[in-house]
Amino acid sequence: MRLHAIRSFALSLPHSTVIKQWGEHLVFKVAGKMFLIVGLDGELIDGLTIKCLPEEFDALTEIDGVTQAPYCAKRHWVRVGDLTALSAAELDRRIRRSYELVVAKLPKKTQATLRQL
């Protein structure tokens, strides 16, 4: 999956934004909370970090190219270092799921505000 496709998909999710952070990382956020980190090596993707449910963690990290994300909450974030480990459709599904998990943890008032926008 190419950077343009991942960026376009992530920004198509309601109220998502992107900033460049921590050097060469694109950090996608909703209401100021991150749901996707894209590591960059120039114009090439050097891995994705996404949120997952703790019960999904073991199955995901058993896939070659998917590991526990460094510097993120244990068993809640995974790093996809090899983008061929998951199909493009599965990556989209996982990015959307990460977004939904982050939105679900936002305060109810913030969620209500997002729905009204």
Where are these predicted regions, by residue range?
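Charge-dense, helix-prone N-terminal extensions
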Residues: 1-117
